[in-house]
């Protein structure tokens, strides 16, 4: 714990967890050569509220690696139905997320889970209604063409609270 503060011990309540205030530690490194670290507020009409986006690896790059972006969805935030022309890979890193392919079942994503969205397949993803969610989005082939559609029905979305 920082000087002058006592470390918290024991389990925290659900209410305490829901009201945690996160503070980003100052960065010692700076982005260089197309690599970035910190996620910044990102507002888009394709998300129902603000998300946080970090361009971790941009493409094209010297290594020939695909583009990697870190996206953090606060509790209850999700995106519109959309389709990636080149496909997309999602790697869950934080919290609990939801992912659904058109005409498919909703899949729960927890840290370490991976979802593959084939080229041309419509899907949506985001935080569960009762949890925040973070993922790394990988855009194969160094391209990233996206077609956006409508939002999933909010009443349907809210039915998907997930046990933590």
Question: What is each model feature region?
Answer:
Residues 103-120:
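Short acidic-glycine-tyrosine-enriched beta hairpin
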